[in-house]
């Protein structure tokens, strides 16, 4: 299976690091690609129950605007834990610890530079999208306001093969704190979810909290404009369909 193959390959990598004698000062950073199995890859439901539990408790999978299409775990660990190691004392990752901090791939850049002993990665002209998440990794008290208070934006203005239902239509979404808003370009509709209370995104709160939705929508639109994001194109009208 793919899991067995991945496990064997990761084991080969760790054994090679050990054979080089550098496992004491080597960090293993492991993460998945975005989301779980796509709609096409999922095929039949587990044990043919008729219930899609591949991503449970998350909704949908890779390519979808819902959490099953974006949320994945991130694991950071020393290749070999050496008690009393001076190198590892500089980054004392608690064993078996779990953080609920909201991270994105760009956060790895400033974090890894810090772990490697880099002094600075900024210049007068540089713009760094990521945030150093070392404190979250070390288990410092949450919430980490810099991580969890910022807006995370996901933008997919393209058509998924076959245009299946389930959030695979062209979309943009934003998460800030506990809240997540999604905009679907084809139908020009918004959805709003409180992820802490509803991780499965089963209850759309867009009608119940219009003020919250409006603030998230304005933030999302401005961030997309600031970054020059491409919009979906109406094939017949041959014009952009910007976020409404």
Question: Which residue stretches match the model-derived regions?
Answer:
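C-terminal cap/loop subdomain of S1 sulfatases and analogous C-terminal strand-loop tails that border
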Residues: 36-65, 82-97, 101, 105-195, ...
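Non-transmembrane alpha-helical segments in soluble domains
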Residues: 7-14, 18, 109-113, 134, ...
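Beta-strand elements within well-structured catalytic alpha/beta cores of enzymes
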Residues: 3, 10, 27-32, 74-75, ...
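Metal-dependent active-site segment of extracytoplasmic phospho-/sulfohydrolases and closely related
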Residues: 5-42
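Long, internal low-complexity/basic segments
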Residues: 108, 164-167, 186-189, 195-244
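Loop/turn elements at helix/coil->beta-strand transitions in domains of secreted/extracellular proteins
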Residues: 22-28, 70-72, 148-149, 177-179
